[in-house]
Amino acid sequence: VKGFVITHGHEDHIGALPYVLKEINIPIYTTKLTMGIIENKLKEHNLLRGTKRKVVRHGQSINLGKFRIEFIKTNHSIQDASALAIYSPAGVVVHTGDFKVDYTPVFGDAIDLQRFAEIGKKGVLALMSDSTNAERKGFTQSERTVGITFDHIFAEHQNTRLIIATFASNVDRVQQIINSAYKYGRKVVVEGRSMVNIISTASELGYLNVPENTLIEIDQMKNYPPEKMVLITTGSQGESMAALSRMAADVHRKVTIQPNDTIIFSSNPIPGNEKSVSRVINELSAKGAEVIFQDAHVSGHACQEELKLIYSLVKPKYAIPVHGEYRHLKANAGVAKSLGIPKENVFIMQSGEVLELCDDYAKVVDKVHTGAILVDGLGVGDVGNIVLRDRQHLAEDGIIIVVLTLERRTNRLLAGPDIVSRGFVYVRESEELMDDARKAVSEALEKCLKGRHTDWNKIKLVIRDAMNDYIWKKTKRRPMVIPIIMDVDV
């Protein structure tokens, strides 16, 4: 591996870097804002000084081994996003990165469609394209439409405090909030660690324009009337520790939700987060706040017509949908086929599969081991499927520990069985259930010992089965059962 080439600064594309760099310390190549965000992350892990980094401008190329990689300007829900044209001895492979076609971006230039067309005219072996919105017809709206929505909201809510939750990385969104705040004479407070860090980085690098005296510290809010304040905060996905969730739960140290507050969710729930977002909305509504969660967000990913445009400009021989769940990849494959790319030239890949490409053929030739490496506290990779399964089991049904003492020489029962439970039932209110469970274990243990079983693993298995059978019969639950046998000399 010669280097990491990063298309943009979203967490799902850069979050693993500090952990991977500890294993293979190789250079990072990316654009200015993306590098600034990465450097913040490397500082947290004390890796900044020892990591080689090179900032690349759109239109520039880098050389890695036999490959030349060109960075192409695109649009996305974070600034400085890039597509990659990878020039290899076998041909050119274009990777769109996460992208949309935005003809009127808030900051910088529109996607460089001309460069895509120029590369397409010279011949492209394969196109790897963003599949996130491949099921959606039409075009993705411009980010500027959200600014129009913000302007309407600010105009209609001039007598209330505004709290806006959005993705920390969406600098364009933050810029439009600041623009509206300045227009309507409001001070802006930024809350949430990730939000503060990215806004600070974007401002320092010239990607965010903040009028003088517009941003204030959260401790200065008390110096201004609520209707002259707007808070930009994290927590748009209902994350339990994010700033907005803590406000909703009345555990935020600096902000208390008031009945006349207006809260705007400038995001759509990521699949899987719907319940968390709904919980926060309900908590905020119960406090009397007005919650707005419609028409204040647009996607950063291309819909079908934008995908068709890129396919038409690039004219690839092979199509490789990327970045999405299987159904998204399949929808993207359908777009490619609708434009005349033969079915046998469209590849929906599984993680780990190795695709061999040349002008004459393309085929899957191997599969390498892949999978999730989980980070838990200071541990990296030490939590696997078995541990996750046990945690899920504990979360759903709790745990019962059966403790008994046997004489070492004869296996005679000296004490117990005692039962300790957590997360199953409240013992003081279920004494009869626990007493009967002890009897069930004692009877099973007595049969086992009469059969002269001396293998403690066998005895533990008998105890576990007896407890499981009894608890299921009485409660229709399956808590985790752990037998503990202590032996003593008498």
Predicted regions span which residues?
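Conserved beta-strand scaffold positions in the cores of enzyme catalytic domains, especially
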Residues: 53-55, 126-128, 263, 291, ...
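C-terminal tails and terminal domains of large nucleic-acid-associated
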Residues: 452-460, 464-490
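A general secondary-structure junction signal
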Residues: 57, 192, 350, 485-488
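Broad gene-expression machinery/nucleic-acid interaction feature
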Residues: 66, 81-83, 399-401, 481-483
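Hard-cation-handling environments
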Residues: 136-452, 460-461, 465
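Conserved hydrophobic residues forming the short capping helix/wall of the S-adenosyl-L-methionine
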Residues: 42, 336, 471
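His/Asp/Glu-rich metal-coordinating catalytic cores
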Residues: 1-5, 10-223, 242-256, 275-278
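Short, low-complexity Ser/Thr-rich regulatory SLiMs
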Residues: 73, 404-408, 488
